[in-house]
């Protein structure tokens, strides 16, 4: 549990540093990290996402209702994915579908967030 909290804090700090220069009212990496922190077990190879995880995914999708918001969220997800050392890339890519939502890109370190539109 302590290791997970430490990792979540590291992800939060990284996201805040990455998103700060591009923020103009867009979603913050802090919000993205907070919404998706219950997904950490699944993203590192654990069993299917928890109801709390899927609730966070749905909350994030509802909050990202403009192109800048979606691009900011994408950049936060991309950065967070790169900072999780044991990231299961298949689970990361499958997360939205497992939670019953559709986003127009894969959660991946190679996603081009500039092409994400509302």
UniProtKB/Swiss-Prot annotation:
Signal peptide: 1-25
InterPro entries: Bifun_inhib/LTP/seed_sf, Bifunc_inhib/LTP/seed_store, Plant_nsLTP
UniProt keywords, alphabetically: Disulfide bond, Lipid-binding, Signal, Transport
SUPFAM superfamilies: Bifunctional inhibitor/lipid-transfer protein/seed storage 2S albumin
Record-level GO BP terms: lipid transport
UniProt GO molecular function: lipid binding
Listed SMART domains: AAI (SM00499)
Function summary: Plant non-specific lipid-transfer proteins transfer phospholipids as well as galactolipids across membranes. May play a role in wax or cutin deposition in the cell walls of expanding epidermal cells and certain secretory tissues. Binds saturated fatty acids, jasmonic acid and, with highest efficiency, unsaturated fatty acids and lysolipids.
Protein name: Non-specific lipid-transfer protein 2
Organism: Lens culinaris
């Amino acid at each position: 549990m302590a290791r997970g909290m430490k990792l979540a804090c590291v992800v939060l700090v990284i996201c805040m540093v990455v998103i700060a220069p591009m923020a103009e009212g867009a979603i913050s990496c802090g919000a993205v990290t907070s919404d998706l922190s219950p997904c950490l077990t699944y993203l590192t190879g654990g069993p299917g996402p928890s109801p709390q995880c899927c609730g966070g995914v749905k909350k994030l999708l509802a909050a990202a209702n403009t192109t800048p918001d979606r691009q900011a969220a994408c950049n936060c997800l991309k950065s967070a994915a790169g900072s999780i050392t044991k990231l299961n890339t298949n689970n990361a890519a499958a997360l939205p579908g497992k939670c019953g939502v559709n986003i127009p890109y894969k959660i991946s370190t190679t996603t081009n967030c500039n092409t994400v539109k509302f």
